[in-house]
Amino acid sequence: GLCYFDNALWIRLEGGEGSVKAARELLGGEEVADQFWQQLREQQLPLFSLPGTLWRISLPSDAPMMDLPGEQLIDWGGALRWLKSTADDNQIHRIARNAGGHATRFSAGDGGFAPLPAPLFRYHQQLKQQLDPCGVFNPGRMYAEL
């Protein structure tokens, strides 16, 4: 694992004991317990309890920091960003799309998924109709119209 949060780079080394020890000696830094990674997995780090909306943003791993208000955590070597922000939904979707990714509102509420272009939305409608003709599986879960 590779994560940047709270002005610190967190690296989780995995593998055989000898390989991990050699990598640890080469990289240096502080050795910490697994607690950080467990708190990240369970969304118990301080970021997740801050006020604002929680966003899960998938981007190319080399995408730059997003210029948005709020706190960011960069995970998966840069490909996954957690953002706690009060920024406008459309602004977050636009910035994620312009960086080659997409944003999903993770906090409760409607409309968390990025708006789909009309042709792709029609495809989703047709697929949903084929797979769920009675409309019983998660109606309105991703998009109110589905």
Give names to the regions the model predicted:
Residues D6-N7, G28-L146:
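Conserved glycine-rich FAD pyrophosphate-binding loop
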Residues G1-A33:
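A conserved active-site cap/scaffold subdomain adjacent to cofactor or substrate pockets
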